[in-house]
Amino acid sequence: MATPRKTASKQGSNGILERLGLFGLGKIEPVILAALASELPLLLIGPHGCAKSMLLERLAKALALEFRHYNASLLNYDDLVGYPLPDEHGSLRYVQTPASIWPAEAVFLDELSRCRPDMQNRLFSIIHEKRVQGIALERLRYRWSAMNPPPCNSAENDAPESADDSVGYAGSEPLDAALADRFGFIVEMPSWKALSVTARNAIISHSDCMVAPAMAQQLHVAINDARAVSAQLEKAFAKQLTEYTRRVVDHSYTIGIELSARRANLLMRVICSVHAVRYTNDPLADLGESCWMALSHSLPQRAQGIRIPDGKLLAAHRDAWKIAQLSEADPRRMLAAESDHVRRALLALLLTQSTDAEASAHVADALAHCKSGAREAFALHLIEHAAIGRVHVAVAEQIAELAATTQREQTFNTSIAAGSTRHAVGMHVECFLASLVQSDEHGLLRNLVISLYARDEKQTIKSIDRAIASWVEMRARFRIEKETARAA
């Protein structure tokens, strides 16, 4: 596979924003520069006072762009296009004002989430296709927007991931899904609390910072270098990145995030741009890390007020990237094709090509996805078939502990105060135990039910019944698969 040619420039991209007087943005600098190199629409999301406007204004100044900054919450359409006036031929032309958008090279639509719906619809074509009323904005290159975090829709018991997640902004509404999906980059700005002490001190002591010509030139060079390398990357890694993108987008549906076909196409371009920026600064930059950086900064759900399950997203990224690096003949590709977590774990244990670490990860993942009852049945199956020799100690201990709840003789204690919920559940358990017959299989189930009741006082009749059903279903599944294998 060809490696992109390193550009001749000796100017690295690392620390450019800091040298422009923008401190604490090092982690998102490759993403910001990638947005400049690709010229894809950029949306910044962050709390008030986190330098969203300063960042974009300073970039426009450094690049010497004809710049328009509009407050979308106050914007009237005439402010944007000028005033309509019929000419002598009866055609409609617009009388431009100093604020008109027509000569702009960069447009910043601030407070986009506070914009009136009718105005937001009119801004849609600017963000999406650089047009107003169907007329092309010939000089427009950059489309930037900013907004405060919208109210976050999450599960009732979800806790905010950080203190900033709990901050609400009156009037900041989630963006329409179609509009949010037009932004190539959706970047969360760091809040004051997220900054290092050094960055905080720098912000305090550098209230104003002039853009030196040398720094402006360095920004130009970094953008041009990244733009050239991005095109090479797209050719050199097309197959690998296409597979990664497809797999991670497919996997996103399983974690509650729906990414569109447009997003898949945009993600590929974002990955190439982000890695191009990182590569021009460090030819040894890891492509997988660039994929993660691109993915985590291009999700429209962040603008829609939909909480991103970051842990699950990272797992989806790792799975997709791992498979994308495998050769076509590698048997481990079967693992990626298998959607059932339990079957995938068993397959990983059988494949000699999978490492012990990979097998352990698949087993741990399967245990995490199994419901109560099914989890214990899966653990017991692994013990019965001596299949834990390849898993790491921590996972093996978890398996042994789960299996022991069914193998160890359990004692049922009914000395609970009458009339309580706990007593009602206990009576339900007692009735179920009385229905079991003397057999090895029912003995395992008996131990499981008593263990579930004893170790968790929050168990309900429904949760006990669900665990029993899950156990029975998983045990039956293993029996059927065993009989099928024998018949074959």
Walk through the language-model features, giving the residues of each.
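Walker A/P-loop
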Residues: 36-75, 85
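Basic, amphipathic alpha-helical bundle interface domains used for macromolecular binding and assembly
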Residues: 207-317
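Terminal-proximal interaction/regulatory segments of ATP-powered molecular machines
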Residues: 314-488
